């Protein structure tokens, strides 16, 4: 059986200001090493199950420091720079040039999710054989702060509403977005080209590709 060709975009440009630390968020330590290292090790462990094409890490805050730490411990990692913090869709677009000649599918995830499981990534890859765009979701008793997932009558994801944009009814929804997606590379950037810049919030939401 032919292995799926998969690339990864890891979003790691944020400052992590809520941590009240000068250390870049993805370099905070968990079990003795930076949290992004845990993600990279899990991705690399998939190489016997998939054709791993590219790993791209989108950097912003303290980019040289993050790049140095990662490059000292891992080889073959690509880096893209998000110069201005214009949201998650803008961050993914920063990686476009590095994937322009790459075929296959891409998983997009955040660099502060060290507990992501190998099983979840494999489940997404399996899901992508039957859908154009796959989104990982979860249910929680306390959905505050997460994007709410709206389903259609066929129980498919219809849209994702960010917490700050949700009305009272939408805020009661307990099905939430993990921020992990899978799509064909060319389709992802086609969808991103349709995402509009929100001039009031100075952001482009990745959730708008749904």
Features from the language model and the residues they span:
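N-terminal nucleotide-binding beta1-loop-alpha1 segment
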Residues: 1-21
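Conserved N-terminal catalytic core of the sugar/cofactor nucleotidyltransferase
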Residues: 2-7, 34-109, 115-123
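Short aromatic/basic micro-patch
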Residues: 29, 115, 182
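Rossmann-like NAD(P)H-binding beta-loop-alpha module
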Residues: 103, 140-169
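Conserved donor-nucleotide/metal-binding helix-loop-beta segment in metal-dependent transferases, i.e.
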Residues: 119-144
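Catalytic-core segments of class I nucleotidyltransferases/pyrophosphorylases
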Residues: 157-210
């Amino acid at each position: 059986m032919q292995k799926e060709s998969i690339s990864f975009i890891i979003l790691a440009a944020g400052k992590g200001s809520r941590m009240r630390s000068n250390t870049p968020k993805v370099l905070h330590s968990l079990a003795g090493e930076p949290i992004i290292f845990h993600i990279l090790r899990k991705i690399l462990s998939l190489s016997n199950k998939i054709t791993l094409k590219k790993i791209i890490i989108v950097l912003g805050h303290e980019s040289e420091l993050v790049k140095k730490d990662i490059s000292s411990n891992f080889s073959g990692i690509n880096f893209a720079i998000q110069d201005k913090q214009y949201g998650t869709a803008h961050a993914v677009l920063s990686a476009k040039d590095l994937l322009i000649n790459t075929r296959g599918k891409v998983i997009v995830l955040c660099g502060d999710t060290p507990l992501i499981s190998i099983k979840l990534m494999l489940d997404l890859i399996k899901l992508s054989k039957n859908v154009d765009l796959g989104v990982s979701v979860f249910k929680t008793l306390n959905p505050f702060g997460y994007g709410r997932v709206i389903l259609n009558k066929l129980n498919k994801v219809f849209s994702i509403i960010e917490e700050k944009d949700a009305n009272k009814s939408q805020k009661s929804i307990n099905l939430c977005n993990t921020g992990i997606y899978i799509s064909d590379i060319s389709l992802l950037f086609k969808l991103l080209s349709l995402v509009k810049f929100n001039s009031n919030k100075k952001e482009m939401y990745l959730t708008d590709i749904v």
